[in-house]
């Protein structure tokens, strides 16, 4: 059976993006995104809130775009996959693990006052296969034009209702 590793987040950036470049020149961008859940506590009746922080990494062109346009506080939509990586602590030499979201789609949300143009959607980084372009759709032949039916003139304007229907 096939498996699914898909993450979708809508949240706010907790800090400005950090962009760096690998030795081969590929851009790498790290951001922290906060998502907030709200609920009403059944026992006390008071409103509760919990914020979860997510580490997100973007690569290549998507990383460059994020570094240029995203700012702390900006609302953003992210699609990607979970990835756990293993690394060694420099001080102790112990194996450490980090789970992060590798983003392959990013959509900036909000208006211009939140740091950039609204509605800018970007994807990239992992689809190395060339995309096939579809041939332009053929328009069906236009139906022959018929003259528009003529409306009969109102017999008497006084017979019309003065009430506006909306």
Curated annotation (Swiss-Prot):
Q: Where is the composition biased (Low complexity)?
A: 132-155
Which SUPFAM superfamilies does the UniProt entry name for this protein?
Answer: Nucleic acid-binding proteins
Q: What molecular function does GO assign, one term?
A: single-stranded DNA binding
Among InterPro entries, the record links this protein to: NA-bd_OB-fold, Primosome_PriB/ssb, ssDNA-bd
Which proteins does it associate with, and in what oligomeric form?
Answer: Homotetramer.
Q: Which PANTHER family match?
A: SINGLE-STRANDED DNA-BINDING PROTEIN (PTHR10302:SF27)
What's the protein name? Answer: Single-stranded DNA-binding protein
Q: Which organism is it from?
A: Bordetella pertussis (strain Tohama I / ATCC BAA-589 / NCTC 13251)
* Gene this chain is encoded by: ssb
């Amino acid at each position: 059976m096939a498996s699914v590793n898909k993450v979708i987040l809508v949240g706010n950036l907790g800090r400005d993006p950090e962009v760096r470049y690998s030795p081969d020149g590929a851009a790498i961008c790290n951001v922290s995104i906060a998502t907030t859940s709200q609920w009403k506590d059944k026992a006390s009746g008071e409103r509760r809130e919990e914020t979860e922080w997510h580490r997100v990494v973007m690569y290549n062109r998507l990383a460059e775009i994020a570094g240029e346009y995203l700012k702390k506080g900006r609302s953003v939509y992210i699609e990607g996959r979970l990835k756990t990586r293993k690394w060694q602590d420099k001080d102790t030499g112990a194996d450490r693990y980090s789970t992060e979201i590798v983003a392959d789609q990013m959509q900036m949300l909000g208006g211009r006052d939140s740091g950039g143009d609204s509605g800018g959607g970007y994807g990239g980084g992992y689809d190395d296969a060339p995309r096939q372009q579809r041939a332009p759709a053929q328009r069906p032949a236009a139906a022959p034009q018929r003259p528009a039916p003529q409306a009969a003139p109102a017999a008497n304007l006084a017979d019309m209702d003065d009430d506006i229907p909306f």
